[in-house]
Amino acid sequence: MSKQAAVIELGYMGISVKDPDAWKSFATDMLGLQVLDEGEKDRFYLRMDYWHHRIVVHHNGQDDLEYLGWRVAGKPEFEALGQKLIDAGYKIRICDKVEAQERMVLGLMKTEDPGGNPTEIFWGPRIDMSNPFHPGRPLHGKFVTGDQGLGHCIVRQTDVAEAHKFYSLLGFRGDVEYRIPLPNGMTAELSFMHCNARDHSIAFGAMPAAKRLNHLMLEYTHMEDLGYTHQQFVKNEIDIALQLGIHANDKALTFYGATPSGWLIEPGWRGATAIDEAEYYVGDIFGHGVEATGYGLDVKLS
């Protein structure tokens, strides 16, 4: 894949929510994100670093993923990737300056992945160097972002092969990394794909799902912040779907907790650097035992 036509990070995402106030409290008190409310009636923003925002919270009541925003390096890469998508038969829409400004980027195109997940490709995000990130609660460190983007997502797909083809076209590498034996004798396969040093930025499998978004992973630089987040979930009796554990692929210490929208957040620490060599696993290193059920991850991992 030419560098002239490749995504380099998950730059931003949009979510829709039914209870904006619950999300403001959750984002700050539970996770340590910064809320930025600029007086817009239909949205507010969540910050993790110097970017104007990393997450847009829309008040339209769907409680699901609205879009994922994938960054390319600049205008030449943007134009080349757009042409790649057209040549491969995908429908894209190049947005005007008004739409681009709404996302606070210099250039924007919109499409959908094969699972119907709204997908945006952009260049030139707004970076507010005069407005340092101010966490919603005290943090020992910060969030891992930079050239690794904001984190990773698992999204719903109905055709894994087509999803792999689409994300490969965007410049991602990766394939099946987990083959998990199920009680019914079948095997669940999960694919993980990366576009930078983060072990993966997107993942998917052939699993039924009520929502587009299964979970979002955010990574702390300090284990103390992960530990405090876990403590906050327990203290506030928020559902924990998977207990603390370490994944076999990204080596991150994480747990999975419920958000006010019913999908999962995966706070983590110490994720490994992505590798290009393919390999797969049949379980995790330890932990990630199922606790609260019904969140789409009722699978024994260790």
UniProtKB/Swiss-Prot annotation:
One example of a Gene Ontology biological process annotation: naphthalene catabolic process
Binding site for Fe cation: 152, 215, 266
CC cofactor: Fe(2+)
Sample GO molecular function, one term: 1,2-dihydroxynaphthalene dioxygenase activity
Swiss-Prot/TrEMBL catalytic activity: naphthalene-1,2-diol + O2 = 2-hydroxychromene-2-carboxylate + H(+)
Cited PROSITE patterns: EXTRADIOL_DIOXYGENAS, VOC
Residue ranges constituting the VOC domain according to the UniProt record: 9-124, 149-270
InterPro entries found in the cross-reference section: Glyas_Bleomycin-R_OHBP_Dase (IPR029068), Glyas_Fos-R_dOase_dom (IPR004360), VOC (IPR037523), Xdiol_ring_cleave_dOase_1/2 (IPR000486)
Residues reported in the UniProt entry to bind substrate: 152, 199-200, 215, 256
Pathway field: Aromatic compound metabolism; naphthalene degradation
Enzyme Commission numbers on file: 1.13.11.56
Alphabetic keyword roster: Aromatic hydrocarbons catabolism, Dioxygenase, Iron, Metal-binding, Oxidoreductase, Plasmid, Repeat
Superkingdom of source: Bacteria
Misc. comment: Encoded on an unnamed 75 kb plasmid.
Family: Belongs to the extradiol ring-cleavage dioxygenase family.
Function: Involved in the naphthalene catabolic pathway. Catalyzes the meta-cleavage of 1,2-dihydroxynaphthalene (1,2-DHN) to yield 2-hydroxychromene-2-carboxylic acid.
Name of protein: 1,2-dihydroxynaphthalene dioxygenase
Organismal lineage: Bacteria, Pseudomonadati, Pseudomonadota
